[in-house]
Amino acid sequence: MYLNACRALTLISVLSLLACNSEPEKKQATPSKEIAKAQTGSWGDQGDGTYINPILNADYPDSDIEQVGDTYYMITSKQHMSPGMPILESKDMVNWTNVGHVFNSLSWAPEYNWDRMNGYSFGTWAGDLAYHEGTWYCYQIDYQHGLMVATSKDIKGPWSKPIMMLPKSEVLDDPAVFWDEDTHKAYIIINTAGKQKEASNTIEGNENRIYEMSWDGTKILDEGKLVYTGMGAEAAKIYKIDGTWYIFLAQWTMGDMSTKPGVKNPKNDRKQIVLRSKESIYGPYEVKTVLEKGTVFNNRSASQGALMQAPDNSWWYMHQLIQNDDIPFQGRPQCLEPVTWVDGWPIIGVDEDNDGIGEPVKTYKKPIDGYPVTAPRTDDDFSSPKLGFQWEWNHNPRNTHWSLTERPGWLRLKASKVLPNEKGYGPNINEWTNNDGSDSDFWRANNTLSQRIMGITTGTAVAKFDVSGMKPHQLAGFVRYGGVFNLLGVEVDEHGKKHLFYMEPMGEKTVGPEITVNDLYIRTSNRSNQAIYEYSFDGKNFKRFGPTFTIAFGKWTGDRLGLFSWNDKEDAGYIDVDWFTYDYDGPKAANQ
């Protein structure tokens, strides 16, 4: 993220804000004229000129935002999902819609392919989105492979194949770039952790280095210079405002070292800090904490995001809530905070306890009035020859084994033989996945298609299936998965008989009634992190099947609603999906 010369023309002088030492004047909230046509709920746009955080209450983590003209563009990480690095756009910072992905596939390594599925938790991590001299840039670090960049003339693509810039041996994560128009130099800051740490640096934590880049943003020109070390310090963003350099970083404050960062512990907090220098991008820097978790989101820390400005020159900050909570099952959502400036420092949110540090707001006036309530699309009737941007595959799909055109108006998922339960296939079993069912067949079954759940209160999704194309040893149906999976579907035995079945996270099956009709409707509902399945043959009368189960965050992924099809013995059989609908307690566009 950077504020280039074109964007700088739209920015108010921060000095005028500093002189006030107060919040920008609050205008009267104006409701959208189209609110009656759309749905609101317990989060996001409320239709009355206000919003409730999180404004994007779903698994859209590690955001970065770039503004071009009157439009804001966001990228978020999505690990091993393909296509990777979702792109969203907004006119008002509150209502966001999906418009594409940076990476059509995770093409740079074999572990992300359908015949390996060995890239769980890796793939696309926190990226940086930039627009410079007519070109879009997306930088990201794959923990297993290193720093890369993709480019495009159009935010909606096509994007180039990634160009590798630095190896994994030198970098860890979270790059951010800046083009300095004053000196005609380009820079990138990277969390190198301890990979280049020298004995002379006795400060505990991650090292963050600034490298000089070529002006075209594709080459590293030097060895980098250390600018900051801190406990878990990462997710840097660079800004130059009125000649002063600011580096925003997320950093852990550990009041209790008995638990790891990221584990629920009220004594620990991943805070937002800011470095400030009036001399050079390399410092020296002053340091200040500008946002802490506060009380409105229980124990969830609030940090890591991007600074923005509205047409009225007010400043705003988008950040995520991290996973240090009992039930962060929806993943890491996005929150929008007002920003005020005091003595040249930003305060993010509202300083509730007057200690000079902001805390997140729960509800606030929208930064920009007049736009309709909307949200990322969820429903699908599969009438388009292309998949909607809400959908992503578990690893790169086997493209010969799915279709939207073989039966127009339906999604066809052909079954492949499940991959072997051997090293190099499926999740790596380690301290984070021990005894969670990661060796179950589901994790090695390719072409599972899914989308994020929305919100944490209630939700109900329904899909209609045609099971007439299924073959012996095939399993297909509906799955909820993130850290664990639970699925309900149809299994065909060796004699060709179809039965309903439920499978729990360790792979144990409960077999249900025989299915002798072609049409099957599966419905799943959740209240908080407790979910159930139901089935129907007519779409009206549903019966419960299987237990109440717990949905969970894991593999750096929140709970997802998905469609699966695999075969235990061979590549054989298919299932057709007519439509998918999803209702939840949150904003939804009128045209869904």
Swiss-Prot record:
Induction pattern: By ulvan and rhamnose.
Residue positions bearing lipid (N-palmitoyl cysteine): C20
Keywords: Cell outer membrane, Glycosidase, Hydrolase, Lipoprotein, Membrane, Palmitate, Signal
EC number: 3.2.1.-
Gene3D superfamilies given in the database record: 2.60.120.200, Glycosyl hydrolase domain, family 43 (2.115.10.20)
Pfam families registered for this protein in UniProt: GH43_C2 (PF17851), Glyco_hydro_43 (PF04616)
SUPFAM superfamilies xrefs: Arabinanase/levansucrase/invertase, Concanavalin A-like lectins/glucanases
CDD domains per the UniProt record, alphabetical: GH43_FsAxh1-like
Protein's cellular compartments: Cell outer membrane
Main location: membrane
Lipid sites, type S-diacylglycerol cysteine: C20
Topology in membrane: Lipid-anchor
Role: Xylosidase involved in ulvan degradation. Ulvan is the main polysaccharide component of the Ulvales (green seaweed) cell wall. It is composed of disaccharide building blocks comprising 3-sulfated rhamnose (Rha3S) linked to D-glucuronic acid (GlcA), L-iduronic acid (IduA), or D-xylose (Xyl). Beta-xylosidase converts Xyl-Rha3S, a product of alpha-L-rhamnosidase acting on Rha-Xyl-Rha3S oligosaccharides, further to Xyl and Rha3S.
Alphabetized PANTHER family for the sequence: BETA-XYLOSIDASE, BETA-XYLOSIDASE-RELATED
Similarity comment: Belongs to the glycosyl hydrolase 43 family.
The protein, known as: Beta-xylosidase
Species this chain originates from: Formosa agariphila (strain DSM 15362 / KCTC 12365 / LMG 23005 / KMM 3901 / M-2Alg 35-1)
